[in-house]
């Protein structure tokens, strides 16, 4: 009996060691998987940053993905022109050339049956003629001040490339893909591997209705990349025209950095759309969002002030923020920043897990 018990103990011990080994292996694999959460209010540029991460790893799009993107390019072009045209009455604008009314009529007919059609030269021609009209260009330039809904910052790029996009064999190039405006609904995940470390990056919807999904799902992330659009200091929310977009972004940042779920989580702040901000600040002061600002109306001083406003929102004086000024559509600049950020996260993660 004693011998039998000894054999059972031996077998049990072997199984225990095997289980311990598997647990340690799984723990090691988990420790070498870095989870990143992209956060920010709607229209801040999160989806573009996620696409840049994909480019960083040279992960190409499938034929099906490119086909879906092409359809979205077509849809965005037509719908966004329609939104601009429909904003004319409230702006008290009229076409100087009566032929543009014909283009609007044809565009309306196309939209009614758009789901059954592919984008073709006739539709592109009507959009192109409308885009050349000075009234349309003025309305586009004033889209934010007039709060014209669903007009992206990169719409002009697609209008200017209509000839290429309208060709029968069109397939989005890397710049089209990067600048394509997509609304994130729910949770989007991208996985890639850098320096033998696996990354799982989550992008969640930025509109208010999407935010309830954030905290309870992502308390174990290694780092948060929070994106705020610098250029939104003189804009209001589409879903609430009484709320300044910059102030809303700061409120969200405050709730995230002071959340008990993210008390020990690294937070990287991307002050995005620096190119648009640099141009806009020449025309309108940031006092639109910050009446207390008394500095000069230049890029350096205003950005420094905004940085301080964000950093002051943290209730934890020991919490370190990594702040970068970004233009998410500038591939070279963002790639360098992302490479630096990812290296920092890898080093921090390995240090915490005792692997470095």
From Swiss-Prot:
<feature type="lipid moiety-binding region" description="N-myristoyl glycine">
    <location>
        <position position="2"/>
    </location>
</feature>
<feature type="binding site">
    <location>
        <position position="166"/>
    </location>
    <ligand>
        <name>GTP</name>
    </ligand>
</feature>
<feature type="binding site">
    <location>
        <position position="30"/>
    </location>
    <ligand>
        <name>GTP</name>
    </ligand>
</feature>
<feature type="binding site">
    <location>
        <position position="27"/>
    </location>
    <ligand>
        <name>GTP</name>
    </ligand>
</feature>
<feature type="binding site">
    <location>
        <position position="257"/>
    </location>
    <ligand>
        <name>GTP</name>
    </ligand>
</feature>
<comment type="function">
    <text>Guanine nucleotide-binding proteins (G proteins) are involved as modulators or transducers in various transmembrane signaling systems. Involved in behavioral responses to P.aeruginosa by controlling the expression of daf-7, a member of the TGF-beta family, in ASJ sensory neurons.</text>
</comment>
<feature type="binding site">
    <location>
        <position position="29"/>
    </location>
    <ligand>
        <name>GTP</name>
    </ligand>
</feature>
<feature type="region of interest" description="G3 motif">
    <location>
        <begin position="181"/>
        <end position="190"/>
    </location>
</feature>
<feature type="binding site">
    <location>
        <position position="166"/>
    </location>
    <ligand>
        <name>Mg(2+)</name>
    </ligand>
</feature>
<feature type="binding site">
    <location>
        <position position="160"/>
    </location>
    <ligand>
        <name>GTP</name>
    </ligand>
</feature>
<feature type="binding site">
    <location>
        <position position="254"/>
    </location>
    <ligand>
        <name>GTP</name>
    </ligand>
</feature>
<dbReference type="Pfam" id="PF00503">
    <property type="entry name" value="G-alpha"/>
</dbReference>
<keyword id="KW-0547">Nucleotide-binding</keyword>
<dbReference type="InterPro" id="IPR001408">
    <property type="entry name" value="Gprotein_alpha_I"/>
</dbReference>
<feature type="region of interest" description="Disordered">
    <location>
        <begin position="1"/>
        <end position="25"/>
    </location>
</feature>
<feature type="compositionally biased region" description="Basic and acidic residues">
    <location>
        <begin position="7"/>
        <end position="25"/>
    </location>
</feature>
<feature type="binding site">
    <location>
        <position position="188"/>
    </location>
    <ligand>
        <name>GTP</name>
    </ligand>
</feature>
<keyword id="KW-0449">Lipoprotein</keyword>
<feature type="binding site">
    <location>
        <position position="255"/>
    </location>
    <ligand>
        <name>GTP</name>
    </ligand>
</feature>
<comment type="similarity">
    <text>Belongs to the G-alpha family. G(q) subfamily.</text>
</comment>
<dbReference type="InterPro" id="IPR011025">
    <property type="entry name" value="GproteinA_insert"/>
</dbReference>
<dbReference type="GO" id="GO:0007188">
    <property type="term" value="P:adenylate cyclase-modulating G protein-coupled receptor signaling pathway"/>
</dbReference>
<feature type="binding site">
    <location>
        <position position="135"/>
    </location>
    <ligand>
        <name>GTP</name>
    </ligand>
</feature>
<keyword id="KW-0519">Myristate</keyword>
<feature type="region of interest" description="G5 motif">
    <location>
        <begin position="308"/>
        <end position="313"/>
    </location>
</feature>
<feature type="binding site">
    <location>
        <position position="28"/>
    </location>
    <ligand>
        <name>GTP</name>
    </ligand>
</feature>
<keyword id="KW-0378">Hydrolase</keyword>
<keyword id="KW-0342">GTP-binding</keyword>
<keyword id="KW-0460">Magnesium</keyword>
<feature type="region of interest" description="G2 motif">
    <location>
        <begin position="158"/>
        <end position="166"/>
    </location>
</feature>
<dbReference type="GO" id="GO:0003924">
    <property type="term" value="F:GTPase activity"/>
</dbReference>
<dbReference type="GO" id="GO:0031683">
    <property type="term" value="F:G-protein beta/gamma-subunit complex binding"/>
</dbReference>
<feature type="lipid moiety-binding region" description="S-palmitoyl cysteine">
    <location>
        <position position="4"/>
    </location>
</feature>
<feature type="binding site">
    <location>
        <position position="310"/>
    </location>
    <ligand>
        <name>GTP</name>
    </ligand>
</feature>
<keyword id="KW-0807">Transducer</keyword>
<feature type="binding site">
    <location>
        <position position="29"/>
    </location>
    <ligand>
        <name>Mg(2+)</name>
    </ligand>
</feature>
<feature type="region of interest" description="G4 motif">
    <location>
        <begin position="250"/>
        <end position="257"/>
    </location>
</feature>
<protein>
    <recommendedName>
        <fullName>Guanine nucleotide-binding protein alpha-2 subunit</fullName>
    </recommendedName>
</protein>
<dbReference type="GO" id="GO:0046872">
    <property type="term" value="F:metal ion binding"/>
</dbReference>
<dbReference type="InterPro" id="IPR027417">
    <property type="entry name" value="P-loop_NTPase"/>
</dbReference>
<comment type="subunit">
    <text>G proteins are composed of 3 units; alpha, beta and gamma. The alpha chain contains the guanine nucleotide binding site.</text>
</comment>
<dbReference type="InterPro" id="IPR001019">
    <property type="entry name" value="Gprotein_alpha_su"/>
</dbReference>
């Amino acid at each position: 009996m004693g011998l039998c018990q000894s054999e059972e103990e031996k077998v049990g011990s072997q199984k225990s060691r095997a289980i311990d080994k598997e647990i340690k292996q799984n723990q090691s694999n988990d420790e070498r998987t870095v989870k990143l959460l992209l956060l920010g209010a709607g229209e801040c540029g999160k989806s573009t940053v996620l696409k840049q991460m994909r480019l960083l790893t040279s992960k190409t799009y499938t034929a099906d993905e490119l086909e879906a993107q092409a359809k979205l390019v077509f849809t965005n072009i037509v719908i966004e022109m329609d939104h601009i045209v429909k904003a004319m009455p409230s702006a008290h604008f009229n076409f100087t050339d009566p032929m543009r009314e014909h283009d609007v009529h044809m565009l309306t007919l196309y939209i009614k049956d758009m789901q059954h059609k592919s984008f073709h030269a006739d539709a592109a021609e009507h959009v192109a003629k409308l885009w050349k009209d000075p009234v349309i260009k003025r309305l586009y330039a004033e889209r934010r001040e007039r709060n014209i809904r669903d007009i992206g910052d990169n719409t002009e790029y697609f209008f200017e490339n209509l000839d290429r996009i309208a060709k029968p064999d069109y397939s989005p190039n890397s710049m089209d893909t990067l600048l394509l405006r997509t609304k994130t609904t729910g949770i989007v995940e991208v996985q890639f591997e850098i320096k033998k470390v696996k990354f799982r990056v989550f992008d969640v919807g930025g509109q208010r209705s999407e935010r309830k999904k954030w905290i309870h799902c992502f308390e174990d992330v290694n780092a948060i990349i929070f994106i705020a659009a610098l250029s939104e200091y003189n804009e209001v929310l589409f879903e609430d025209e009484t709320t300044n977009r910059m102030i809303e972004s700061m409120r969200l940042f405050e709730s995230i950095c002071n959340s008990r779920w993210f008390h020990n989580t690294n937070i990287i702040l991307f002050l995005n759309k620096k190119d648009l901000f640099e141009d806009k600040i020449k025309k309108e002061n940031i006092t639109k969002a910050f009446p207390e600002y008394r500095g000069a109306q230049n890029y350096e001083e205003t950005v420094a002030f905004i940085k301080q406003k964000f950093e002051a929102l943290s209730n934890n004086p020991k919490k370190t923020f990594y702040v970068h000024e970004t233009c998410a559509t500038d591939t070279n600049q963002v790639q360098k920043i992302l490479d630096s950020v990812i290296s920092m996260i890898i080093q921090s993660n390995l240090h915490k897990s005792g692997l470095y």
